[in-house]
Amino acid sequence: MEPGDTPLLLKRVDPARNMNRFYHLSVEPTLFGGFAVRRTWGRVGTWGRTRLDLFADVTLALAHQQKIAAQKHRRGYCPQ
């Protein structure tokens, strides 16, 4: 599995609560030989916020991506 092969787009929609959110996860190489898990989240239609989590090894980065995806799935986010 290579970085960049597994971008995930998760959405959570609940019209009764006026909720329309997205969560995007991707693993990307950094300029210095490491890897970053890029998380972007917010309301659909906005730029959202972004956070980078840095890792020295691609397997650690991919494991972190899957851990976050599992947490979001438990909170009601679904893959798109």
Q: Where on the chain are the PLM-derived regions?
A:
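Short N-terminal "domain-start" leader segments
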Residues: 1-36
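A generic structural signal for ordered alpha-helices
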Residues: 3-6, 15, 39, 43-46, ...
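Generic preference for hydrophobic/aromatic residues in regular secondary structure cores
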Residues: 9-10, 59, 77-79
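Short, intrinsically disordered low-complexity segments
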Residues: 11, 38, 71-74
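Short aromatic-glycine-(Arg/Gly/Cys) micro-motifs in beta-strand/loop hairpins
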Residues: 25-51, 66-67, 78
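A short, charged, amphipathic alpha-helix used as a generic interaction element across diverse proteins
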Residues: 47, 56-73
